[in-house]
Amino acid sequence: MNTYHSPMSTGASAQSDVRDYEANLPVIPAQDFQLTDYGAVGDGVTDNTEMFRLAIASCAEAGGGRIVIPAGVWLTGPIVMRSRIELHVEAGALVTFSRDFDQYPLIASSFEGWQVVRCQSPIDGDQLEDIAITGEGIWDGGGEAWRPVKRSKMTTSQWNQLVASGGVVEQSGGEEKIWWPTTAALEGGTIANRLHEEQVRDVAAYEKVRDFLRPNMVSLRRCKRVLLDGPTFQNSPAWNLHPWASEHVTIRNVSVRNPWFSQNGDGLDIESCRHVVVENSVFDVGDDAICLKSGKDAEGRELGLPSEYITIRDCTVYHGHGGFVIGSEMSGGVRHVRVSDCTFIGTDIGLRFKSARGRGGVVEDIQIERIYMKDIIMEAISFSFFYANQEGSARGSDLSQEISEETPVFRDIRILDVVCAGADTALLVSGLPEQPLDGVIIQRYNVQARSGIQCAHAKHLHIAELQAQITEGPLVHLHQCKGAELESIQGKGADGRLLMVTGHESAGIVCREGDAETEGRQISVGPEVRSGVIIRR
């Protein structure tokens, strides 16, 4: 049996952890099937949909094997995977997917945390075992034919060129806002949402909004032993790679690319999966880069499939809304995650944890170490539980709501050995008053940022061996925090303050004596803060 072991656990006591983090590789017969033997032509014009189908059927009937796609430009409609099959794109091979929406039938699928009706994905598989996509070639999802584009993300010349290509423009307040590829795509959102809310499962009911239901590029659902090794996956209609409810998934040595302006242009969304390894891969995308999810709201909680035993290592992220992300759809839970040795350059946010009231779910036992960041546009590290635009989700309120199964829980998160050369904010925590962020450890963090640590509604927060250079405000601002501890802090705020504490519920803030009021660093408390809140040791 082929396995991969997480490197994060060491020592005699770690044996059970090593077994837990195993990811078994697929077992596929060592026999090749040449795509060209089935009449395929790599001229970029010939539609090879039937040739791919014949090759896959022949391979499956022979017990499985490897389908070899040689150098060339191979146009095709959707490819439906089967068990014990490897698609191998050789160097110089470019597989492009048809712009004809009618080639993509509507099917029951999954998107943004819900089980929904979508167009079939360019690469699609459901309830399969032992599948692989390998090689040094390129898969291009033809996403420009599907995706809406926001005017705010285009220069004037880019926008004019896009509008001149066809499609329709959505206007608001007399201004052009969004380009859509077709009128049906523009009008489809409202209808599709209504059908989903009414729990309409009849696929035929969605036919009139087909153009809106753009697919993820690679959708693998309820699969076991999956390997993606080597190719470039680019230009997806929606998310790029989406394993859902699958086990033993290995993704390595891949390049995942989407235009920076691509709507829902995520790189990799691991949703409700177990035993996953992602390593030695590069992401440059239009939304979150490497993201863990587990269903959305009541539907996700009812399904109850957490993402767990996940290892991510040695990856590089360039553009993306977040480098490594958990949420916001995490209602089934995320746990037992190990992330190490990753580099984020120019991402909007580095480490991003997001949720909202209504989600529910528990995120716990997350360990992240040796993360290197440069030129982060917003927060280097962010915890925001006010992500969704729904009642009670406005950031900054101290008003608690009743705790229920809809309340998300984030706890036991360890972030170690992080270097960030440039960010707007070193750390932002926006916890829920009724369910604060619990048990976060940040240790050995070297950061240069405009503002320092801004933390609201957290408990049992431990920050140690922080080296920070900031240019605005206090170094650390704790608001409505309980049981926070600062230790071995180097640096001070631009205003001379090491620490500012506000909020009448703040309590048990421990500041080591060696860190307090030295080198002109001051500690300040708001007038509402009770006496004795700051404990010096």
Language-model segments: residues:
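Extracellular/periplasmic carbohydrate-active domains that bind, remodel
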Residues: N2-R537
